[in-house]
């Protein structure tokens, strides 16, 4: 038996996102988002599922916070529905939307759970998408207005802020690969979107400082780790592109003032350029306090000229996989956290990490041993990095609840709490009770 003791101030938590859990998509003045439009379009989401009701957390947040309290977590990462605050993207504020988040944040604080707020987790107001979305620089100022409104409203109530969740998904998965809303397939648009959201990030950080908002602010990329299939230079380069597009494309401009040149050149060969205007890089480089890291898996990659715009193909090496098909390899988390040290020994929070395991309720229980094993393996790697001297400050398990898993609909379950989407009955899984013990003890026990 081995005990892995965590620092006394380590922030144990869990995470969700607004569109995935709230539901109430037409209630109390909320406008439509690109995910409403996308999910309501036949063929875009598995089984025609949508987030109209989701986990109904808009009406059941008190029950969900009670379950968090019983879990013993110190922090809860949630996101704000932009169209719930600004139904048209900008202009007039919807007070009922603000009131809802005040109720949530106040109840979290009353229960000793620190709110960890993500401003943008993919639900762009449809009205802005109709005008070009993140491909239009107008959206930058609309986002800053939204961010400033949140900073003013929740100053003193929220101490941890993230501007954007997984910018790679916002830019490339959604606008180049077309898998997520708005479902576009244009490389230049994807690069425009990525740059504009970084400018919006920088301007929001600047406004955060100008307003004297309490707490810390950062951004949460979904990082990737890949190892080459062979020792060939082509395979090594394919891996470098995979890693760098997820991590460096969005962090290097913030920390070093430039995009990775080898990727700039790679995209230029495909006819796409970064739309940098005067002053953009200074804005993007506004100092941040921390970063959130979302990590799920690593891959083995090789060069394949037919494998998409990166020409990097993932190879099945026979590793165990979760039910969504992602290989389980916790070493990648350790490697990528060390890789990011080139930007300095910055404060890092693991803002998402978890496994899709589709176990069902049997005799009132969900015995999700594979999820427990996954979390245990990854927490060992988190402990290793802390022991190495890295400033990893917290871990937020994805997710509190089974929820609407984007293009997979309700077909894939990541929660530590099972949700029956017909009845909305919540059933804590064995992973919930296992994690509760880890949080309570502040240490992890493994058998070797």
Swiss-Prot record:
Catalytic activity: Hydrolysis of terminal, non-reducing beta-D-glucosyl residues with release of beta-D-glucose
Record-listed E.C. numbers: 3.2.1.21
Active site: 166 (proton donor), 352 (nucleophile)
Pfam families for the chain: Glyco_hydro_1
Functional summary from the UniProt entry: BglA is intracellular and cleaves cellobiose probably through inorganic phosphate mediated hydrolysis.
Gene behind this protein: bglA
Name this polypeptide is given: Beta-glucosidase A
UniProt cross-references to Gene3D superfamilies, sorted A to Z: Glycosidases
Subunit structure: Homooctamer.
Any one Gene Ontology BP term: cellulose catabolic process
One annotated GO molecular function: beta-glucosidase activity
This protein's UniProt keywords: Carbohydrate metabolism, Cellulose degradation, Glycosidase, Hydrolase, Polysaccharide degradation
Source organism phylogeny: Bacteria, Bacillati, Bacillota, Bacilli, Bacillales
Family stated for the protein in its record: Belongs to the glycosyl hydrolase 1 family.
Gene Ontology CC terms: cytosol
């Amino acid at each position: 038996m081995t005990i892995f003791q965590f620092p006394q101030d380590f922030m144990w938590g869990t995470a969700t996102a607004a569109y995935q859990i709230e539901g109430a998509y037409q209630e109390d003045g909320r406008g439509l988002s690109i995910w409403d439009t996308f999910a309501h379009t036949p063929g875009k989401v598995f089984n025609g599922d949508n987030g109209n009701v989701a986990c109904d957390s808009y009406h059941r947040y008190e029950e969900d916070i009670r379950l968090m309290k019983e879990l013993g977590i110190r922090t809860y990462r949630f996101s704000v529905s932009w169209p719930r605050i600004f139904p048209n993207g900008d202009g007039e504020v919807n007070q009922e939307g603000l009131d809802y988040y005040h109720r949530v944040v106040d109840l979290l604080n009353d229960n000793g759970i620190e709110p960890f707020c993500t401003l943008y987790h993919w639900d762009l107001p449809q009205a802005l998408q109709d005008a070009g979305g993140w491909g239009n620089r107008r959206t930058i100022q609309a986002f800053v207005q939204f961010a400033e409104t949140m900073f003013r409203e929740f100053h003193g109530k929220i101490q941890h802020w993230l501007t954007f969740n997984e910018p790679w998904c916002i830019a490339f998965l959604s606008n180049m690969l077309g898998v997520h809303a708005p479902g576009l397939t244009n490389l230049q648009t994807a690069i425009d979107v990525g740059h504009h959201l970084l400018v919006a990030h920088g301007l929001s950080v600047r406004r955060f400082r100008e307003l004297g908002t309490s707490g810390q602010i950062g951004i949460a990329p979904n990082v990737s780790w890949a190892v080459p299939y062979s020792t060939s230079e082509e395979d090594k380069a394919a891996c470098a592109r995979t890693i760098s597009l997820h991590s460096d494309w969005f962090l290097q401009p913030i920390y070093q003032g430039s995009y990775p040149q080898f990727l700039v050149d790679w995209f230029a060969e495909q006819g796409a350029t970064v739309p940098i205007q005067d002053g953009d890089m200074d804005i993007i480089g506004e100092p941040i306090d921390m970063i959130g890291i979302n990590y799920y898996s690593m891959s083995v990659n090789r060069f394949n000229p037919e494998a998409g715009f990166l020409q990097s193909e993932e190879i099945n090496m026979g590793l165990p996989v979760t039910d969504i098909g992602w290989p389980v390899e916790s070493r990648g988390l350790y490697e990528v956290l060390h890789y990011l040290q080139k930007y300095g020994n910055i404060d890092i929070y693991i803002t998402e990490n978890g496994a899709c395991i589709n176990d069902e309720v049997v005799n009132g229980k969900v015995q999700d041993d594979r999820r427990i094993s996954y979390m245990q393996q990854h927490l060992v790697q988190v402990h290793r990095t802390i022991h190495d001297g890295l400033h990893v400050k917290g871990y937020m398990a994805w997710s509190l609840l089974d929820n609407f898993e984007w293009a997979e609909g309700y077909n894939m379950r990541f929660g530590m709490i099972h949700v029956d989407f017909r009845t909305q009955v919540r059933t804590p899984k064995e992973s919930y009770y296992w994690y509760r013990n880890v949080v309570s003890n502040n240490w992890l026990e493994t058998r070797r």
